[in-house]
Amino acid sequence: VGSKPRLVLLNKADSADPEVTVMWLDYYAKQGITALATDCRSGKNVSKFYGKLKELLKDDIEKWNAKGMSGRPIRIMIVGIPNVGKSSFINRLAGSRLAKVEDRPGVTRGKQWVKLDEGFELLDMPGVLWPKFEDKLVGERLAFTGAVKDDIMDMEYLACRLLEFLKENYPELIEKRYGIRTDDIEPADEETIGCVVGFELLERIGRKRGFLVSGGEINTERAAITVMDEFRNGTLGRLTLEKPKAVSYT
């Protein structure tokens, strides 16, 4: 976006860890970047969107008014990775289902202009991802959210990695949702932590849920899909995958 004014939306805030959301808002404020935590399902803070934009564009709007251009539409663009709720956010703003919404990446195929209230016109863009992830962990966490298409991912491995993250950061969510212990599993070493520990948790969940196949073996594929679905739809509880690194919190 170059030097153009930017408003960062922290969407799906009602599914995020509220304490970490505060950290992110503080982080962006210290960088001089305006940020707003929103949620499209509840409508939280969506009404503040126009006010934040007008604050950012105050100087530009004053210049346009001075030139007698007060009636011109203010054009803005929304960009982001796939599956973060861009279309749902637009629908909230527009008051109707103008943008197609599905819980999978790649639903918005082309650019489209949407007329909003208060003189704004918004350009909706398809979600975009980096062609390559230098940090494997970044790619994994994006895959957790569904930003990467599931049909190119190993869902069992993905669920194991997610469960390992949850064990280290939100063990109470696993225990509450699935009724299993997490504190009696020790990792073999750092290289296998996401496979060995995560797979043990996945098997426990499958056994607890009764996901069994012939011979009494655990259907770990079904367990993996269940874990990923319940993480993505918020059933597991409120959690955040990453904290800001540039700010120290004690």
Question: Whereabouts are the PLM-identified features?
Answer:
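A structural signal for isolated positions on well-ordered beta-strands in alpha/beta enzyme cores
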Residues: 7-8, 77
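Short, structured loop/turn "capping" segments at alpha-beta junctions
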Residues: 60-64, 91, 97-103, 169-174
